[in-house]
Regions:
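Charged, low-complexity interaction regions
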Residues: 24-26, 107-108, 148
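Alpha-helical oligomerization segments
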Residues: 130-172
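N-terminal interaction modules that seed assembly of large macromolecular complexes
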Residues: 2-72
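Short, tandemly repeated low-complexity microdomains enriched for cysteine and small residues
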Residues: 27-31, 111-114, 136
C-alpha cells in the first residue's frame, strides 16, 4: 500500500469522523479541524522521511553505479539504517503515532476507545483509502497489451499511462 499526499486530508477527516462517531474519541466540533491537522502532520512527516530515504537511495545507487533493479533492496537497507519503517510497517507506524497523538493532543477532549480496537479501525480506513501499487500496475499493463514489455517505447508508454491512471484516481 502506498500513501499519496493527495489522500492525506480525506484520510485525516475520515479518521477523526469515524472515531468521534463511534464514541472512541471526543472532539469539540470547533476543534475538529485542528485535530485533523495533527493527523495530517503525522502523515506528511512520514512522507518527508520516505522522500529522504528515496533520495539517499538514489545517491548511493548513483555513486556505486548500481542498477535500478536493486532499488528495493538498497532502499530497505537505507530505511533500516535510519530506523524508518516502510510498506505496511510504515502504515502501522503512522497508526501508532496517531494513537499516541490522541493521548497528548489538546484538541482531543477524551479518549474512550481501546488502543487495539481503534488501531484496527484506523487500519481499516487506511486500507480503504490507500492504493495498492500492484493494482495500478495491473491496470496499466492491461492497457498496454499490444506492446512488448522491456522495449524503450513500452517504458515510455508505461510511465505515461501510469500517470494518467494516477490522475484519474485523484492520486496526483
Amino acid at each position: 500500500m502506498r500513501l499519496y499526499r493527495s489522500q492525506i486530508p480525506r484520510l485525516a477527516e475520515d479518521i477523526i469522523g469515524t472515531l468521534a462517531l463511534s464514541g472512541d474519541i471526543v472532539v469539540e466540533v470547533s476543534l475538529r479541524p485542528e485535530a485533523e491537522q495533527d493527523i495530517r502532520a503525522i502523515m506528511e512527516e512520514y512522507l518527508r522521511q520516505e522522500h529522504r530515504v528515496v533520495q539517499e537511495t538514489r545517491e548511493i545507487m548513483e555513486q556505486r553505479q548500481i542498477t535500478y533493479d536493486q532499488f528495493g533492496r538498497i532502499k530497505g537497507q537505507v530505511a533500516d539504517s535510519k530506523g524508518h519503517p516502510t510498506g505496511d510497517d510504515g502504515i502501522r507506524w503512522i497508526v501508532g503515532q496517531i494513537l499516541e497523538n490522541f493521548m497528548i493532543s489538546k484538541y482531543i477532549d477524551e479518549v474512550f476507545g481501546e488502543d487495539r480496537a481503534m488501531r484496527r479501525g484506523i487500519m481499516g480506513l487506511f486500507r480503504k483509502h490507500l492504493v495498492e501499487e500492484a493494482d495500478l500496475d495491473r491496470e496499466v499493463r492491461s492497457r498496454l497489451k499490444n506492446m512488448r514489455p522491456g522495449t524503450s517505447k513500452w517504458d515510455i508508454e508505461y510511465r505515461r499511462v501510469m500517470e494518467d491512471v494516477r490522475r484519474k484516481r485523484g492520486l496526483i
